[in-house]
Curated annotation (Swiss-Prot):
<dbReference type="Pfam" id="PF23611">
    <property type="entry name" value="zf-C2H2_16"/>
</dbReference>
<keyword id="KW-0539">Nucleus</keyword>
<comment type="function">
    <text>Gap class segmentation protein that controls development of head structures.</text>
</comment>
<keyword id="KW-0863">Zinc-finger</keyword>
<dbReference type="GO" id="GO:0010468">
    <property type="term" value="P:regulation of gene expression"/>
</dbReference>
<keyword id="KW-0238">DNA-binding</keyword>
<dbReference type="GO" id="GO:0005634">
    <property type="term" value="C:nucleus"/>
</dbReference>
<feature type="zinc finger region" description="C2H2-type 3">
    <location>
        <begin position="39"/>
        <end position="50"/>
    </location>
</feature>
<protein>
    <recommendedName>
        <fullName>Protein hunchback</fullName>
    </recommendedName>
</protein>
<dbReference type="GO" id="GO:0035282">
    <property type="term" value="P:segmentation"/>
</dbReference>
<feature type="zinc finger region" description="C2H2-type 1">
    <location>
        <begin position="1"/>
        <end position="5"/>
    </location>
</feature>
<keyword id="KW-0479">Metal-binding</keyword>
<dbReference type="InterPro" id="IPR056438">
    <property type="entry name" value="Znf-C2H2_CTCF"/>
</dbReference>
<dbReference type="GO" id="GO:0003677">
    <property type="term" value="F:DNA binding"/>
</dbReference>
<dbReference type="InterPro" id="IPR013087">
    <property type="entry name" value="Znf_C2H2_type"/>
</dbReference>
<dbReference type="InterPro" id="IPR036236">
    <property type="entry name" value="Znf_C2H2_sf"/>
</dbReference>
<keyword id="KW-0677">Repeat</keyword>
Length: 50
């Protein structure tokens, strides 16, 4: 919790300059570097990574 107050962002992306406070946020961000679309609409062609 204190990292939020002090601006510490120890989790850094290896592919861009993104950094964040916790590992789960980094894991979510890493999906932006892939072409995998996990969530697809059953009724149309819409798909999203998140």
């Amino acid at each position: 919790h204190l990292r939020n107050h002090f601006g510490s962002k120890p989790h850094k992306c290896r592919k861009c300059n993104y950094s964040c406070v916790n590992k789960s946020m980094l894991n979510s961000h890493m999906k932006s570097h892939t072409n995998v679309y996990q969530y697809r609409c059953a009724d149309c062609t819409y798909a999203t990574k998140y």
